[in-house]
Regions:
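C-terminal cap of metal-dependent C-N hydrolases
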Residues: 92, 154-220
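Short, solvent-exposed cationic patches
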Residues: 219-235
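Conserved active-site and cofactor/substrate-binding residues in soluble primary-metabolism enzymes
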Residues: 3-7, 57-61, 69, 104-112, ...
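Residue-level signal for inorganic ion chemistry
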Residues: 25, 77, 116, 201
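A short acidic, glycine-rich active-site loop
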Residues: 46-57, 100-107, 183-189
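Histidine/acidic residue-rich metal-binding segments in metalloenzymes
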Residues: 1-74
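Short glycine/proline- and charge-enriched loop/turn segments
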Residues: 38-47, 87-100, 177-180
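His/Asp/Glu-enriched, well-ordered alpha-helical/loop segment
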Residues: 73, 80-166
Length: 235
């Protein structure tokens, strides 16, 4: 589920303290954005759960819950919609003039990792192990793909991102490849970006930004039962 409130986090903590197998995730939009985005973006900021008040306690609580290990994963909730589906909601974010529902969703995939590094590691001082935990190992554990995925060790697939921690750049929709035609992070200045990625030990994205593997390189991944995610504060 997309955890977005302090109250929800407190209930997760209570359930975990009682020994229940309850794991959760949150998303960059709930760590970084507020309901003020509705004034700027209107229907383009219509997501579920909704963005929370700017003067509320939720964002800081989620950051702390993630750093302390109560929130296992940070996921993109990538749900792009074409502009034509969102634009009719400018006057009413719920339905258009004909009563057709305005869809939920916003793009997040292309900004997930840069924002995690820039806002979590570079600005808040969280360790790199936090980023590896919430973006890689814990998701692999939760969805039954660990230890083949999500970890660097003998026998695992060599899925690696070689990261440039010093790169400084500005998020711009014009550089994105998705269908949404916008990003809620337009104009954000961030630090860090992928220099190269490898999938199963082979270069996927090279330093020139070119894909080196062809369609068909992907492989079916059979799932096993979930493995409890890593808990406790990151160090």
């Amino acid at each position: 589920m997309h955890l977005s409130t302090r109250l929800g986090l407190e209930r997760i903590k209570r359930a975990q303290a009682e020994g229940q197998k309850v794991w959760c995730e949150t998303c960059p939009q709930y760590l970084l954005l507020t309901d003020k985005e509705m004034e700027r973006l209107g229907p383009f900021a219509k997501i579920g759960p909704p963005l929370r008040p700017a003067d509320g306690p939720d964002r800081e609580a989620l950051w702390q819950g993630s750093a302390q290990g109560f929130i296992a994963n940070v996921a993109s909730d990538h749900s792009p919609r074409v502009p034509a589906a969102k634009e009719p909601g400018r006057k009413n974010i719920f339905v258009d003039a004909q009563g057709k529902p305005i869809p939920f969703g916003a793009p997040s995939l292309e900004t997930l990792v840069p924002l995690a590094w820039s806002e979590g590691v570079a600005k808040r001082g969280l360790p790199v192990t936090w980023m590896a935990r919430v973006l890689a190992e814990n998701p692999a554990r939760t969805f039954g793909l660990w230890p083949r995925k999500g970890v660097i060790r003998p026998g695992a697939d060599a899925d690696l991102t070689i990261w440039d921690p010093t790169a400084e750049w500005t998020i711009q929709q014009a550089q994105h490849l998705g269908i949404a035609g916008f990003t809620p992070y337009e104009g954000w200045k961030v630090r860090g970006r992928a220099w190269m990625t490898l999938v199963r030990g082979q270069v996927m994205l090279n330093p020139a930004g070119e894909l080196e593997q062809k369609p068909g390189y992907g492989r079916f991944l059979p799932r096993r039962g979930p493995t409890p995610p890593i808990a406790g504060a990151v160090a």
